């Protein structure tokens, strides 16, 4: 992973290491200020505007302070995005039906991704993950995999209810859900909206629900 600017000097690292432990509340305040500054730059001007220098200046901290938590601007950007999304998480309480649960999973993500600043940032992070293996590992583990696991839980519950066959290929079903969303997000050829979410869910269900045609 390429650094966007020079790493802090060793003296800065030593000063940080020697900081008194009683300063933890201040450290947390600094961490939140860094996340807020990074999010402001990210949403206003995109990933390219997020540099350690720019974030440090905006947050009123040293670069050494930033490097204590984030080794690169990409990991900082990902955490800043998570901090912004904290209040927009898909509901986890079951509706009692597979369709209802899948709609509840996808709607919050699509509402956020379809807004211009967030959609642009997600697209930039996906692009970065294609060219930077180290960042790709972080992106997959922290952004992609948790959402896939939420979908797996929903499909497993549907199998237990007898709503879909026990031999349903869950990984393929998860791909069927998220694939169309990312395709529209990255290419921008058609809108990401509520109707599209319903169409994706219903088309996925038609592909995995038992039918007389498949029973023979």
Tell me what each language-model feature is:
Residues 60-70:
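Short hydrophobic/aromatic patch on the recognition helix
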Residues 80-81, 113-138:
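Amphipathic alpha-helical segments used for helix-helix packing
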């Amino acid at each position: 992973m390429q650094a966007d600017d020079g790493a802090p000097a060793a003296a800065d690292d030593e000063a940080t290491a020697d900081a008194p432990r009683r300063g933890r509340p201040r450290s947390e305040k600094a961490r939140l200020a860094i996340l807020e500054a990074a999010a402001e730059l990210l949403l206003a001007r995109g990933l390219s505007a997020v540099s350690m220098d720019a974030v440090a200046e905006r947050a009123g901290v040293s670069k050494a302070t930033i490097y204590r938590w984030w080794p690169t601007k990409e990991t900082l950007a990902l955490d800043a995005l998570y901090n912004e999304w904290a209040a927009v998480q898909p509901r986890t309480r079951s509706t009692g039906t597979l369709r209802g649960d899948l709609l509840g999973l996808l709607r919050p993500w699509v509402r956020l991704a379809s807004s211009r600043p967030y959609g642009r940032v997600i697209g930039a992070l996906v692009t970065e993950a294609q060219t930077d293996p180290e960042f790709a590992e972080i992106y997959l583990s922290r952004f992609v995999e948790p959402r896939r696991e939420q979908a797996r839980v929903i499909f497993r519950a549907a199998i237990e209810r007898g709503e879909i066959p026990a031999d349903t290929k869950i990984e393929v079903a998860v791909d069927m859900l998220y694939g169309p969303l990312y395709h529209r997000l990255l290419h921008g050829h058609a809108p990401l909206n509520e109707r599209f979410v319903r169409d994706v869910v219903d088309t996925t269900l038609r592909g995995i629900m038992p039918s007389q045609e498949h029973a023979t």
